Amino acid sequence: MRIRSSWEAAIDITAPAQGKGLIMPNEQLPGIEQAFGVLRQFTRSRRSSSEPLERCELCSAGLAHEHPHLVELATRTIVCACDPCALLFDNAAIGKYKRVSRRALRLADFAMTDAQWDGLLIPINMAFFFRSSLENRVVALYPSPAGAVESLLPMEAWQEIEESHGALMQLKPDIEAFLINRVGHAHGSAQAEYYIAPIDDCYRLVGVIRMHWKGLSGGAEVWTEIGRFFSDLRVRSEVISEVPHA
C-alpha cells in the first residue's frame, strides 16, 4: 500500500468529492496551507539539526561539538579531527600532525618579576610560549587585532625564567604553551595569571581578540570576552603549586 505524501493528502481534502474524501470550505484553505508550512519547516529544522556542524579535516566524518584537535607542525594550524583519526597522532613523536593535549594547569604561586617580564620584550601584557620541535626553539607569540604575532625571544631572558620553574621544563612540545595574562597586574586590578594550556586554547584566545576588537583600545566587548575566556580556563584548570628551582 502506497503511503501518500502530505501534499497529496492536502489535495484529496480540497478536491471535489467523488464518493470519497471530504469537501473543505474554501475559507479554511489558508489554515491548511499554514499548517503544512509549519510542518515543512519543522521537518527541515529536524533534518538540519541532525547534520554535523563540522567535519573531520582528514576523513570528512561528522564531528560532535566537542572533538579532538591536531596541530599541523609546519604551519602551526589547528585541525579538527574525529576520534579515530586523532588516535593516529596521539603521543606522536614525528610526523605532520600531533594531537593537542587537553591538560590545563594553573600555576598558582608562579613568580615573575616585572624586570623578568620586560626582559622577554613582549609589547603587551599577554603572551604564550611553546617549544617547536621542528625549529628546535621556544616560540613567543602574543595576540593582536590582526592575529597572532611572533616576537623575537631573547633566549637568555627565557632561560633564566625556565630554569627557575620546573613546570616550564615539562612543557609538551608543539601541543602545550605557557600562557601569561598580566593585564590586570599591569593596571593594579588583579594578580598576574600563569597557565600551562593546550595550544588550541591559546589560538582561540587570539581568535577572540581578533573577532571582537574595535577601535584603538578594543572596546568593552573584547575585554568582556577576554575575561570570559580566562574565567572558563580557570574553571577547567587544575591548580598546582609551582615550586621554583633553587
Label every PLM stretch briefly.
Residues M24-A104:
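N-terminal cysteine/histidine-rich coordination modules
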Residues E160-A246:
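C-terminal, charged low-complexity interaction regions
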